């Protein structure tokens, strides 16, 4: 009976292994929550992982659930998730049996109403505005007549066609288009990189640097225009050194890039109108200004002619002014003939005097003098050359003599150096031997001092050193107790001993008798 009550009672509960239970829970949850919509705030979002997947959590004021967006789904999202954004996520709940954790795999993601996005925009606008990115002092004036216009927009669509058509109608200039995505994943980075890329161009590079930038996109919902609210786009627009016109959406659509841009255009077409003036209007203004200038010039010319006429009436006539000069000219012309005749006579007389000095005998004498002078100079030159040759020969002979005596001089110098080296070597050997002798003597003296101070000498005089069990010297009896093992060191070695109480040798050893043993009365068998 006792065995019956002690045995385990049977049960109807099924027995699971841990993996079976985890798998059953996984199937139950995934079946019950195959498609769910969850409203919550994004928490812990740090952007997509290097694999392309995005991991974060959805939370409210009382709970949180892990969430994941796979790479393929992430690329199809209409807007980018951001930290603190309230969203509605659609997907399925799944678990990990290995760790008993569950999460929602998001298939679609949308903001929880426009109010959530507007609240996020207002918070970002307040924060960036506090940094001064929207200050009016940062705004730059647009150039009146740009030579090159840079456009950041989608290469396909009506926006770029409208901008090019409007610029062509008003004032044809060179347009550079930087194609980008204007919505979806990665569009914000492309727009920011395009703005920075235009600013990085050098003015004298092969691709001309634009004088003004237009960032444009057509109309759309708040989610479609969300890329132009990205912080990276706003900062790139605020940092642009090139004047920037934002033309995103329609006139009623406002994005954060509109506050950071230098000028906001209501539409892309309006941006083109702001960028360039109307050529026909400029031509009309130029024609009107030219007409006004011509009228001013005509009036000035008339006034100057009238002034000249007035001045001419005040001056005497030309005949009166030239009467005296004409008379002087006639008198000078009359005296010119006589002057020429006198000048000719004087020149002829001078020529005759020169000819008188150029007789053949005088020329022969001068030639003889010059020849004699030349001969004397040649003789002096020959003597000078001979002296130079003699001095050079003497120098050569002295150099040869020096070279001939050089081996003997080198040999004598070498012998003297060898003899000096031998003397130095002998002196060095002698000095080293003296140093070694003094060092040995000092070492012997120090060794004798060391031996005299060694405790071994004391032991040779009959003393001993007592050491305890730790081989430490014992200098007082109080340091020992009965029953301790000690070592006694003599001059010729060590022995072991045991301490006793009161200094009595162990075993009550008796003093040996020095008396000879008395012979016994009992006889010996031997």
Swiss-Prot record:
Segments for region (Disordered): 497-526
InterPro entries noted in UniProt: Exonuc_VII_L, Exonuc_VII_lsu_C, OB-fold_nuc-bd_dom
Protein localization: Cytoplasm
GO BP terms: DNA catabolic process
Record-level GO cellular component terms: cytoplasm; exodeoxyribonuclease VII complex
GO molecular function, one term: nucleic acid binding
EC number: 3.1.11.6
Keyword Cytoplasm: yes
Catalytic activity line of the entry: Exonucleolytic cleavage in either 5'- to 3'- or 3'- to 5'-direction to yield nucleoside 5'-phosphates
UniProt-listed Pfam families: Exonuc_VII_L (PF02601), tRNA_anti_2 (PF13742)
Subunit structure: Heterooligomer composed of large and small subunits.
Record's function text: Bidirectionally degrades single-stranded DNA into large acid-insoluble oligonucleotides, which are then degraded further into small acid-soluble oligonucleotides.
Recorded family membership: Belongs to the XseA family.
NCBIfam families: xseA
Official protein name in the record: Exodeoxyribonuclease 7 large subunit
Source species of the chain: Rhizobium etli (strain ATCC 51251 / DSM 11541 / JCM 21823 / NBRC 15573 / CFN 42)
């Amino acid at each position: 009976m006792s065995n019956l009550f002690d045995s385990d009672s049977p049960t109807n509960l099924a027995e699971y292994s841990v993996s079976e239970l985890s798998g059953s829970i996984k199937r139950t949850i995934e079946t019950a929550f195959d498609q769910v919509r969850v409203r919550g705030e994004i928490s812990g979002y740090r952007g997509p992982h290097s694999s392309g997947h995005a991991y974060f959590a959805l939370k409210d004021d009382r709970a949180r659930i892990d969430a994941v967006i796979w790479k393929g789904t992430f690329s199809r999202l209409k807007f980018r998730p951001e930290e603190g954004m309230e969203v509605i996520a659609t997907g399925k709940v799944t678990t990990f049996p290995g760790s008993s954790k569950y999460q929602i795999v998001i298939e679609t993601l949308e903001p929880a109403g426009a109010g959530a996005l507007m609240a996020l925009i207002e918070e970002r606008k307040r924060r960036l505005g506090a940094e001064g990115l929207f200050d009016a002092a940062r705004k730059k004036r647009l150039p009146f007549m740009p030579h090159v216009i840079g456009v950041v927009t989608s290469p396909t669509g009506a926006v770029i066609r409208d901008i090019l058509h409007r610029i062509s109608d008003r004032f044809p200039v060179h347009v550079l288009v930087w194609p980008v995505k204007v919505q979806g994943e990665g569009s914000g980075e492309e727009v920011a990189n395009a703005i920075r890329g235009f600013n990085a161009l050098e003015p004298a590079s092969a691709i001309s640097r634009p004088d003004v930038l237009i960032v444009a996109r057509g109309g759309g919902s708040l989610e479609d225009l969300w890329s132009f609210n990205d912080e990276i786009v706003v900062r790139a627009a605020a940092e642009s050194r090139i004047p920037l016109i934002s033309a995103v959406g329609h006139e009623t659509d406002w994005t954060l890039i509109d506050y950071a841009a230098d000028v906001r255009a209501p539409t892309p077409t309006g941006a083109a109108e702001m960028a360039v003036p109307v050529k026909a209007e400029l031509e009309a203004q130029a024609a009107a200004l030219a007409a006004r200038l011509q009228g001013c010039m005509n009036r000035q010319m008339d006034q100057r002619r009238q002034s000249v006429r007035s001045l001419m009436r005040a001056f005497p006539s030309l005949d009166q002014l030239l009467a005296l000069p004409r008379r002087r000219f006639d008198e000078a012309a009359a005296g010119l003939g006589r002057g020429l005749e006198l000048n000719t006579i004087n020149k002829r007389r001078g020529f005759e005097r020169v000819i008188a000095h150029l007789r053949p005998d005088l020329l022969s004498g001068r030639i003889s003098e010059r020849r004699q002078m030349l001969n004397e100079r040649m003789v002096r030159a020959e003597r000078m050359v001979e002296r130079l040759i003699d001095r050079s020969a003497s120098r050569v002979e002295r150099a040869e003599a020096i070279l001939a005596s050089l081996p003997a001089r080198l040999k004598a110098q070498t012998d003297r150096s060898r003899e000096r080296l031998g003397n130095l070597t002998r002196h060095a050997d002698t000095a080293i031997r003296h140093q070694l002798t003094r060092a040995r003597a000092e070492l012997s003296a120090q060794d004798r001092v060391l031996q005299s101070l060694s405790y071994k000498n004391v032991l040779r005089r009959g003393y001993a050193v007592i050491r305890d069990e730790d081989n430490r010297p014992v200098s007082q009896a109080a340091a020992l107790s009965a029953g301790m093992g000690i070592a006694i060191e003599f001059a010729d070695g060590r022995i072991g001993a045991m301490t006793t109480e009161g200094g009595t040798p162990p075993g009550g050893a008796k003093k040996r008798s020095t008396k000879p043993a008395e012979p016994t009365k009992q006889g010996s068998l031997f």
